Amino acid sequence: MPIYLAEKTKNLIDQKIEEDQGSKYREWLGKVIPTISDAFDPRNGRRSHLGVSTIGDPCARKLFFQFRWVARPKHHGRIIRLFNRGHMEEGRFIAMLLTAGFKVWQQDAEGNQFRISELGGHFGSAIDGIVVGCPDMPDPNQAILTEMKTHGDKSFKKLLKDGMKVSKPMHYAQVQVYMRKMGLAACLYIAVNKNDDEIYCELIPLDAAVADQFIDRGCKVVMAEEPPVGLSTKGASWFECKMCDFSDNCYRNEPPLVSCRTCSYSRVVEDGTWKCINPVVNRTITTDEQIAACSHYEMANYYGR
């Protein structure tokens, strides 16, 4: 399986930063970092949609539970800092590309962040950006997707050895869906080793069949009327199950958190809304109402079995 290293891009970034010893790079950082709103957002709201970044996860049951708010893990402070670092690193990636002479877009003409969605937004995500000027493309003027990721040392070394598709299949699924929905033929995947700041650049071509497979998977998970079969068939001792946020729900009959999404009366609607079919309510329910639930809550009968 070919790996299309974007060596010209990597070398150009290093060359341009070195030319003035990082002056222009730091200037861009000062402009870009304040725009990375996710890094400074104080809210801890629940994600109302199934994110594209998770669609390559091997366990469809886990995806169903995420979308249905079955559990809400409380992360250790170190993990929260790790998540935030990923957001902050996005600003550094963008500053690198701008320093190297790339054109970078993250918003449309109305100032809205580029997003892709299916089923009225039930399945979707914002993309990292679109770039023009990649010297590794046959036509550098062609607009392509860019996806930016941070890696620990072990993960980064595997990436160097095997390429993104093999070493990070969830990243591969994510960018395939993005490219397909955005009508882009390639993705510039940029990664950084958090240990020593080494960067890795690879071009990922669109595989429409793979993209369609994962889009279909996302839609099926969203519209599923009960939890799909997942890795839980392997048993509680399976390593991915032991680390899963929903292990207690799968193996130890832990009831789900109370919300409309775990209620027997709730229904997903293809237009991006949720509906309560309880005869007393019988209407569309807002996200705030879903979080709060109501006095008619009745746990869906597929939990605990």
What are these regions (language model features)?
Residues 142-148, 185-189:
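Conserved active-site beta-strand-loop modules that form the wall/rim of enzyme catalytic pockets
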Residues 154-160:
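Active-site-adjacent loop/helix micro-motif of nuclease/hydrolase catalytic cores
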Residues 148-152, 193-194:
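A short mid-domain helix/strand-loop element embedded in enzyme catalytic domains
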Residues 1-145, 152-154, 165, 295:
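Metal-dependent nuclease catalytic cores that hydrolyze phosphodiester bonds in DNA/RNA
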Residues 7, 18-19, 27, 89-90, ...:
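Glutamate identity and glutamate-enriched acidic tracts
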